[in-house]
């Protein structure tokens, strides 16, 4: 049985003080959660948030990282730096990173491998645009991403991997995939992983849904056979809303 994982992607929001206040309010609200609870602050807030959640059941994720260990990469953060801070997860390949920062599948494959090398669990994002959904190429688009992004991993790594399916057209738009659409696509992603690494490993890979997840949508989503959690955007910025999702 796969343990659900619900992660809150704060994107470019919250100062250090606001971030600490947020997790201090969140801690008592999610202390009895049956799923893994993850918050994803900005780089500048990671250390303060990590310290603030110490001793609680809340894990911390970075929103990105570089695949090189060090060097002349101005503005970037190395995986070893995150590992030294005790960061648990890293979100990789979010559609905003792919679109605005031209992240390629080749670079993401390097990042996924490097995260595992540094004992950080990747939350790898994949998804299609509205145009791709409407012209029936959803699975083809996602398969190209998955095949490139998770190539060359060990079965053990694949079993630890978290994948987040986020239809790009449902992010921040208020539109959501129907629960059935989300589940069917996630089932297809699991089949892609199985084709590469066998069904035993694919059955252990946790696959989240991301895309305008709200307190009033989560319960039905989590009742679907293949949805193992959520990557939450806007609703994760409000402690009560995020807690309501975590405690679905």
Swiss-Prot record:
GO MF annotation list: triose-phosphate isomerase activity
Binding site for substrate: 9-11, 172, 212, 233-234
Complex and partners: Homodimer.
Gene3D superfamilies, A to Z: Aldolase class I (3.20.20.70)
Protein name: Triosephosphate isomerase
PANTHER family on file: TRIOSEPHOSPHATE ISOMERASE
Record keywords: Cytoplasm, Gluconeogenesis, Glycolysis, Isomerase
Functional summary from the UniProt entry: Involved in the gluconeogenesis. Catalyzes stereospecifically the conversion of dihydroxyacetone phosphate (DHAP) to D-glyceraldehyde-3-phosphate (G3P).
EC number: 5.3.1.1
Family: Belongs to the triosephosphate isomerase family.
UniProt superkingdom: Bacteria
Subcellular compartments: Cytoplasm
CDD domains assigned to the protein according to its UniProt record, in alphabetical order: TIM
Active site positions: 94 (electrophile), 166 (proton acceptor)
Keyword Transmembrane: no
This protein's GO CC annotations: cytosol
Matches recorded under InterPro entries: Aldolase_TIM, TIM_sf, TrioseP_Isoase_bac/euk, Triosephosphate_isomerase, Triosephosphate_isomerase_AS
Annotated catalysed reactions: D-glyceraldehyde 3-phosphate = dihydroxyacetone phosphate
GO biological process: gluconeogenesis; glyceraldehyde-3-phosphate biosynthetic process; glycerol catabolic process; glycolytic process
Keyword Isomerase: yes
Pfam families xrefs: TIM
Pathway(s) per entry: Carbohydrate biosynthesis; gluconeogenesis; Carbohydrate degradation; glycolysis; D-glyceraldehyde 3-phosphate from glycerone phosphate: step 1/1
SUPFAM superfamilies per record: Triosephosphate isomerase (TIM)
Species: Clostridium beijerinckii (strain ATCC 51743 / NCIMB 8052) (Clostridium acetobutylicum)
Parts of the chain that traverse the membrane: none
